[in-house]
C-alpha cells in the first residue's frame, strides 16, 4: 500500500512539474521563427510573456500597452512567417489545419470550436499586433478552461 501511495505521489508531482514548466514557457517559444521574430522586433526572451501569464489574463494587468503591443508583434511575425497570417488577415483554414496538426484535436473537439470563436472575435481588428496577441491569449485561455473542466470531470 505504501508503494502504491508513493507512486501516486510521484505521478502527481511529475504532472504538476510538467504543467508548471509549460506555464513558465514563453508564448511562441516552441516555434522555429521565435528567435528570428524576437530579433526583428528588437526584443529578448525576457520581454515575452509566459504561457501561464497569458492564459490566466495576468498579462493585461501586469504590463503596459507598449509591452502588450510588442508581444503581439512577435506573435504576428511568427504567424506570418508560418503562412497563417498576412498583415492583419488570418488564413482561417490554414490556421485550423495547423492547430489540428499541433494539438491532435479531432472533429467536434471543443478546442477547435474555441479557436473558431477566437478568430471570429478578433477578425475585424485592424492592428495586426494587437489582433495577434488577443487571438493567442483567447486560445490559451480557452485551452486552460477546457483543461480545468476535463480534470474536474
Curated annotation (Swiss-Prot):
<keyword id="KW-0813">Transport</keyword>
<protein>
    <recommendedName>
        <fullName>Pheromone-binding protein Gp-9</fullName>
    </recommendedName>
</protein>
<comment type="function">
    <text>Colony queen number, a major feature of social organization, is associated with worker genotype for Gp-9. Colonies are headed by either a single reproductive queen (monogyne form) or multiple queens (polygyne form). Differences in worker Gp-9 genotypes between social forms may cause differences in workers' abilities to recognize queens and regulate their numbers.</text>
</comment>
<keyword id="KW-0590">Pheromone-binding</keyword>
<comment type="similarity">
    <text>Belongs to the PBP/GOBP family.</text>
</comment>
<dbReference type="InterPro" id="IPR022354">
    <property type="entry name" value="Pheromone-bd_protein_Gp-9"/>
</dbReference>
<dbReference type="InterPro" id="IPR006170">
    <property type="entry name" value="PBP/GOBP"/>
</dbReference>
<feature type="disulfide bond">
    <location>
        <begin position="73"/>
        <end position="129"/>
    </location>
</feature>
<dbReference type="GO" id="GO:0019236">
    <property type="term" value="P:response to pheromone"/>
</dbReference>
<dbReference type="GO" id="GO:0005615">
    <property type="term" value="C:extracellular space"/>
</dbReference>
<dbReference type="InterPro" id="IPR036728">
    <property type="entry name" value="PBP_GOBP_sf"/>
</dbReference>
<keyword id="KW-0964">Secreted</keyword>
<dbReference type="GO" id="GO:0035176">
    <property type="term" value="P:social behavior"/>
</dbReference>
<keyword id="KW-0589">Pheromone response</keyword>
<dbReference type="Pfam" id="PF01395">
    <property type="entry name" value="PBP_GOBP"/>
</dbReference>
<feature type="disulfide bond">
    <location>
        <begin position="118"/>
        <end position="138"/>
    </location>
</feature>
<keyword id="KW-1015">Disulfide bond</keyword>
<keyword id="KW-0085">Behavior</keyword>
<feature type="signal peptide">
    <location>
        <begin position="1"/>
        <end position="19"/>
    </location>
</feature>
<comment type="subunit">
    <text>Homodimer.</text>
</comment>
<feature type="disulfide bond">
    <location>
        <begin position="37"/>
        <end position="77"/>
    </location>
</feature>
<keyword id="KW-0732">Signal</keyword>
<dbReference type="GO" id="GO:0005550">
    <property type="term" value="F:pheromone binding"/>
</dbReference>
Amino acid at each position: 500500500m505504501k508503494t502504491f501511495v508513493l507512486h501516486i505521489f510521484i505521478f502527481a508531482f511529475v504532472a504538476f512539474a510538467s504543467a508548471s514548466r509549460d506555464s513558465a514557457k514563453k508564448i511562441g517559444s516552441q516555434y522555429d521563427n521565435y528567435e528570428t521574430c524576437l530579433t526583428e522586433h528588437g526584443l529578448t526572451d525576457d520581454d515575452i510573456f509566459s504561457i501561464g501569464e497569458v492564459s490566466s489574463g495576468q498579462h493585461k494587468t501586469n504590463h503596459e500597452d507598449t509591452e502588450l503591443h510588442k508581444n503581439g508583434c512577435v506573435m504576428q511575425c511568427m504567424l506570418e512567417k508560418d503562412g497563417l497570417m498576412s498583415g492583419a488577415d488570418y488564413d482561417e483554414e490554414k490556421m485550423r489545419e495547423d492547430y489540428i496538426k499541433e494539438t491532435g484535436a479531432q472533429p467536434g473537439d471543443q478546442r477547435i470550436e474555441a479557436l473558431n470563436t477566437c478568430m471570429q472575435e478578433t477578425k475585424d481588428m485592424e492592428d495586426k499586433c494587437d489582433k495577434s496577441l488577443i487571438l493567442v491569449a483567447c486560445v490559451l485561455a480557452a485551452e486552460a478552461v477546457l483543461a480545468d473542466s476535463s480534470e474536474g470531470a
